[in-house]
Amino acid sequence: MKKALMIFAATFVAIAVAMPALAAVEFQYGGVFRTRWITSNNLNDGSSDVQDNNNMFDQRLRLYLTFKASENLKVVWKAEIGNVTWGSFKGGRMGADDVNVKTKNAYVQFNIPNTPTTAIIGIQGISLLNSWLVDDDFSAAAFVTKIDNFTITLAYIAGQNYPDSTGNETESYYSSTKDNVDDYAFAVTYDQKGMPIKGTLTGVFMNANMVPWAIYPEVMQSPVTSQAYPAGQTTTAALPGVFIGSTNYYSTAANPSTSIAGISWMGNKLDGVKNNQMFDLGFNLTYKIDWLSAYVNFAKNIGSVKTASRQVIGLKGTSTGTEAVYGSVIGGVPLIDVGQVQDLDYTGWMIDAGVNYFCGPYTFNMGGFYTSGQKTKDQRVYLYDSNGNITGSYVTQRYQSTDNVDFFTYPGTTSKYFSEIVGGGILDAAGPFASAAAGNNGSNFWRGYGFPSNLWTVTAGAAWQVLEKTKLSASYWYFQTSESVGTGRFNTDLSEKMSNDIGHEFNLYLTQGIVDGLTLDIVGAFLLTGDAYARNGYIGVTTAGTPYIVQWSKDNVYEVGARLQWDF
């Protein structure tokens, strides 16, 4: 921290010395400082059987520097120091020195002469459709045109430009686009002064080439490369980026290293990705008068991706004796059928609506949203004995359909906040079992904070402005999955218990102004968990192929904390 402050001090001195020569340049500054205390229990696993109590302090400082030549030209730099967790080895322990200054934004903004268009070029924040499409910092070029009551935005977002020289393809990796992700966006807003209605039509075209972006939501946090394996390539190894053996969004195993061949329990293996293109089209309508406001957001996934899906055609064991497990069968009998290359259509959709009523010091709100989920199917598979002979029995296995990409997905990174526990809220340092990181094998086939998918909710809340600087607010949320998800697998025949119930969440906030814009928020949240919040057991398999049952009891979740913040 001391090194960072010295850097900033030197920068300010240099600017001060240069100011006489730069008299035409106006210097502006601002920023946000926050520090938080967070404690929670059962947030990560929905159970008290394993210790997952979290108690921590963290802090973050963002500085906004603007160099303004005129109303027609300015350069903006936004830096971030943090997040720093108190007591950590990365700048939070005694001494506190660390290299933790990051660039959030760095762009030039200028008006194009003789046109009504403003250009913004560089690393910038872009939010579309109230965070339902994208909401993050991007390397991008945006052009905003204002004509009468219309505002038209066109943008190019460089999601990923990753040359790959390690693949099997012969062309020069310098010109290869197979690992590129490009987004092209537009937004047309109609807003007439004096009218209570405002509307926006938004579209984003994603061209992800051979990158599994949007198919697996966790990839959008940290895109991966195609590794040069086109759709239809056959291999038995789990290849980075290809997700042929998904142990991420579709997996329910607790430890991927103990699963055989990396086969997920309710998902099918994919043999690479090709021609991954999606178009999202959505709209927002808002209505606002003195005592009432209302809104609705809608978005639809359109497009397709070419891939190959592998089906489980055989299991090892018997339905009444030895546990049915995945694994190699003596004699070379294949348990996995290499699927044919096919086009999967993006069919997901979402809708979000709400209303707020203002009555003096009181505000009342209600609303909710729905995001589609991945449909599931039952398939009948053979059972083989240890010698590779069919036992004559079948079992029914539930798995996630790969006929289409049915769950609502996103063309770029976003950060959608809503409730405190499932939706990130103010204390977003940790997310729930199913959402903290989609790579978590307990993801249970739904997502909350960050990229809501296979999730719907209804909510109601109220706020009371007790004093000028004191506000109390509370909200209730009921969550379910749109498509049922697995809650546990214990039976020999691999049947899956299913549920939609995530739970009832209650949030309570006290907001207190302290001095000169410094604000303290005190937060309390409690979730009565349903069966779908997290799995309560599964059949594990050792590397030697020996099955074992893992089971834990379900418990409720709480989160308590505070945030001290100054916007300046």
Task: Name each model feature, range by range.
Residues I157-D164:
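His/Asp/Glu-rich, glycine-adjacent segments
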Residues S127-L133:
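A conserved hydrophobic secondary-structure block that centers on an alpha-helix together
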Residues G167, V211-T234, A238, K306-E323, ...:
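Internal, charge-rich low-complexity segments
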Residues N365-K377:
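Hard-cation-handling environments
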Residues K3-I123, V134-D135, A141-L154, N168, ...:
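Beta-barrel outer-membrane channel/assembly domains of diderm bacteria
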Residues Q227-S259, V381-P452:
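Flexible glycine-rich, low-complexity coil/linker segments exposed to the extracellular/periplasmic environment
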Residues T202-M206:
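A conserved mid-domain beta-alpha-beta active-site/ligand-binding segment of alpha/beta enzyme cores
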